[in-house]
Structure formats: C-alpha cells, structure tokens
Amino acid sequence: MNAPARRTPLYSCHLAAQARLVDFAGWEMPVNYGSQIEEHHAVRRHAGMFDVSHMLALDLTGPDATAWLRRLLANDVAKLRTAGKALYACMLNPTGGVIDDLIVYRLSDNQYRIVVNAGTADKDVQWMRRQIGEMPANVTLTPRRDLAMIAVQGPHAREASWKAFPELRAGSESLPPFSGAQLGDYFVGRTGYTGEDGFEIAVPADKAEAAWAQLLAAGVQPCGLGARDTLRLEAGMNLYGQDMDESTSPLDTGLGWTIDLKDEQRDFVGKTALLAAPATRQVLGLVLEDKGVLRAHMAVFTPDGEGETTSGTFSPTLQRAIAFARLPPGVAAGDTVEVDVRGKRLKARCVKLPFVRNGKALV
Amino acid sequence: MSTIPNDLKYTKSHEWIRLEADGTLTVGVTDHAQAALGDVVFLELPEAGRVVSAGEACAVIESVKAASDIYAPVAGEVIARNDSVTDAPESVNADAYAAWLFKLKPANAGDTSALLDAAGYATEIAD
C-alpha cells in the first residue's frame, strides 16, 4: 500500500486556483493551473510563484556547525564569510555519488539553514543524523516542517513581493543574489531555480495561505511543477533523481564546479572516491535542429562515441526542443550530433548551458 | 468536465471520429485527451496514401510533458492530413474537435460499428 499523499499548507489555495494535481515524491502537488506554457512565460516576462513547501528546510546550530558542514558537503561553507550568504552544494556518499543537492545559508557564526529536495528529505535527515554521530559533532539539526515556502520568480518578482509584503522592502532591497535574511516572520532568500531574479520566501505554515493570497493580489501568477521543469531546464539546472543520483559522480553530471578542493586539509565525505575517479563524461546542452521533442534517456550519437540525454523538453522560450546530454569528452559546443528520437535519428546542436538566463536566449 | 459531442464516435484510446456523408472518417483526439496531455507542442501525422490497420499507431502527439501515440480507429487508407494543425499544435488544446488530424477511407464500412458512442466514451473515462 502506498502512503496517502502529503499536502502542503497551501493545498486549499491550489484547489481554489483550479490546479491539476499530481503525485510528486509522495506529495499532492500542482502540475499546472491551466496552461504550463503560459505559466512559464509569466516567470520569464513578469512574475510567477511556486509552492515549494514540499522541500524541507533544516536548521543547524551548534559550535561545530561549520566544521561539520565542511565535512558533510563537497562544496566548502567556509566560503560563506558573511551572514546571509548562500551556497549550492552536493552531499555525497563515500563512493562519490550524490545523495542530494541542496542550498545552505549561513545565518550567523554557528547557525545555518539548509534546504533539501522533497523526494530525498527523509533519507537526507537520516544520513545527516548518522554523520553527526560519526564525527561526533556538537550540533543540533531541526527539520522545519512548520514552515511553508513560496518561490516568487521573474523579472518583476521582487517588486511584486514588496507590493504583497511592503514590510519586507527595507530589509530585502539590498539583498545580493544568492543570499537571504530573516525579516520578522519571513525568511527571504534571493535564490531560485528558474534562471530569473526573485525571492524564495519561508513563512510559518499558518501564515502561508494569507501570503499566497497577498502575492496573488499583487499580480503574481501561480505556477506548477510543469513550468518549474521547463524553466529549470532552460536555466541549465540539474534535477535530482533525473540528472544525477547516488550512482552518479557530480563530475560526470556537470557539477564539477561545486566540488571545492582548494583547502587540501579539508576532508569531506566522497572526496577520496572523487579524486580516484576523474570525469569520464561532460554535460552539454542540446538544441534540436529537426522537428520533434527531446526527452530523458535518448541515445546521442557523436563522432567520439555515444552519449545520453538526462532531461529533455520543449523550450517555450526558444520554441525548440532542448535537453541535457552526458557526452564523451571530445564533443564541443557548436558540434552537431544525432539523437534517437522514437526510432528516428534527428540532428541536434551542442551548446553550453544555460539555454536562457534573465529572460534572454543564450543559444 | 470534458466535452463529448453526441454526433461523434470514439475509441478507448481517446480518438474522436466523425463519419462523413461520403463514407470517409475524420479523426482527432478528444477534449479529455488534450486536457490530460497539457500543452501540445508537436504533431507527427501520417501521409496521404498510407495504409493502416485497426489499432495501428500512425501518428504522434507530443505535449510539453510527454509523447503519445495516436491509433487508427479502423483499417483503411489515409486520404488527407491536417498540415495546419502541425503548424499550430496549440489548436488541439484550443478546440480538440475542430483540430482534426487525418482523414481515413475505411477498408470495410462495417468496421465503424464497433466504435464507442458518446455515452460509451463518457463511461470509459469516468474512472
């Protein structure tokens, strides 16, 4: 028997907005509220909002918090020199596979906020608790299911957020990209998953519906997981479980830039395995030149050997099919390759990621 | 609620079929199917002259989410395809019953009697 689907504090808002609901990692989540493509364009051109309460925020406190995170994560939290700064990082297993990708905010000297994926949240917490015991570290890890999270994204996302919550303006106006701040009841992070500017706002669960209604009144379009997927693909951002998982090295999935080896003294889980196994693949974007749609796990034929797509979709911004492909090292941006699309070999052009940034096509 | 016009026939695989006065069939996908697929972005339709058997996958409809086959409702020969819908795939979402996909000349006129009527299709998608 499957467990009953979990619902976020915004469930009734989704029903009111006539969402089409689907199961996502055990959560009943909106895939769209009508047209996925219109929601996609709303984020590229104006402002959209996503219920991301199914993701889990965790608070980490204690004198060993920094030392422990420097061992837990392949990226180095020592880079977070000022309070509020955020870091994207992979949490690896001892064989160098990706347990999860996450964002960590430094709140103060011994206090961090970590945001992990929904589908991996339970596994992540178990793993983290085990690592606390193994070090052992004087830290406290607190899952924050009492928070709801709304990601407001788009060129007008910040203005719309201030219209909805005027009290946040003073504290968040000068917030640099990839940083966050606690402002009264709200934790505001200037981060996102769409390639646009915006805020990810965490609020106490009992204030979530009011926050959603205020954003709606400020003209922000509700957007579902469908648009979230096309937007993140255009933005060149990996999706856990699709573009990487516990069996893949971050080096083979385009995440080598998140592995920080600068401090040779620093040991982190998975480091030995990564150093012993250099990258065998590179990740490039594909833009389909022929007509059709690219999907995950299509074979890619190149003069240097075969590769495979890991994610693919129709790009509403480019009006063409796009994909991420894991390819042999010899292939370069600008090369033409062939993709097996439902039994036909179609031509695709290799490009550097991302495809789109800040509303502009880059390919 | 999906629209299911009474004057059309249907298949369990979500094609609608209009029986034309000259004995030919016009085929499309139902409103229920387009709603489930989401935004349609690409169609691959069979060429005129192609001979198909009943239930044969003869066209592809792709939404942002996924690709789906479209099946021949009966055996016959494709006599026309709607190129204007391949140029504007979103017209399937706008009006699934106006956006026909191809026309078919049945091999045996009697084959159409096995197709579902509107009530039968409504029962089929009720679950």
Curated annotation (Swiss-Prot), chain B:
Cofactor or coenzyme needed: (R)-lipoate
rRNA processing is among the record's keywords: no
Cysteines engaged in disulfide bonds, as pairs: none
Details of cofactor binding: Binds 1 lipoyl cofactor covalently.
Residues bearing the modification N6-lipoyllysine: 65
Superkingdom assignment: Bacteria
Biological processes per GO annotation: glycine decarboxylation via glycine cleavage system
GO cellular component terms, semicolon-separated: cytosol; glycine cleavage complex
Ranges of residues in domain Lipoyl-binding: 24-105
Keyword vocabulary terms for this entry: Lipoyl
Chain's role: The glycine cleavage system catalyzes the degradation of glycine. The H protein shuttles the methylamine group of glycine from the P protein to the T protein.
Family to which this protein belongs: Belongs to the GcvH family.
Subunit relationships: The glycine cleavage system is composed of four proteins: P, T, L and H.
NCBIfam families found in the cross-reference section: gcvH, PRK01202.1
Record-given protein name: Glycine cleavage system H protein
Lineage, uppermost ranks: Bacteria, Pseudomonadati, Pseudomonadota, Betaproteobacteria, Rhodocyclales
